[in-house]
């Protein structure tokens, strides 16, 4: 297979090392991946869109990558949504930065401090989902954040331990998404037309972040020796949400329209290919049984 990496980086090497060294049930992740691929019938269904991954689809011979669409779930209503959504409805259009790093990565104490200080310096309204690792010594939001942060950002910041991500991204007050660039989160932002402020942490996230930048729907946070700096955090958030936000949101909204337009078509095409594959498999089985 010839899956072309977008760019040769230290992050890509780290991703490969992770896949090679880590295992489940005695089989490494890279072994599981290749086993799935070699057992496939020349077709690999991918949670993506032609609009996003056209180059990768062209370079994957002899296997054909078939996009099934972003498969982004529609926002669900939950009882504890209302406080957050009520706060969001009071904000100006495209004025809020939504900050969330998914459910599998937990910020270090240093990262937490730089992001908090950066949000404070930016003067941009924000919703920040703050989570702690189960084994962490930190047990409360007050312990995790810089002293006085909540008081200094009172009125323009909302700190929560969970948030209805899809509903927030879909809301007109949301102007930017500070994200780790996990694939599902990246697709959600693209489908809802929200520019991404990328802070990739591990695995495929650096590759996803580069894709976001190349497509003109976000910016990656500059880091020196992988370390965040509050000044850069503030600067990039302001650029995406305020200073360059209008043009970037226009590009993101245009991409969103194209993705939604193609979504049903891509899914239907994928189902047709699966039906065809099953049909061909049955024909081959019948032919093989006649030969024996």
Which residues make up each language-model segment?
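A short, small-residue-rich loop immediately preceding and capping a beta-strand
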Residues: 179
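Aromatic "clamp/platform" in nucleotide-sugar-dependent glycosyltransferases that forms part
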Residues: 182
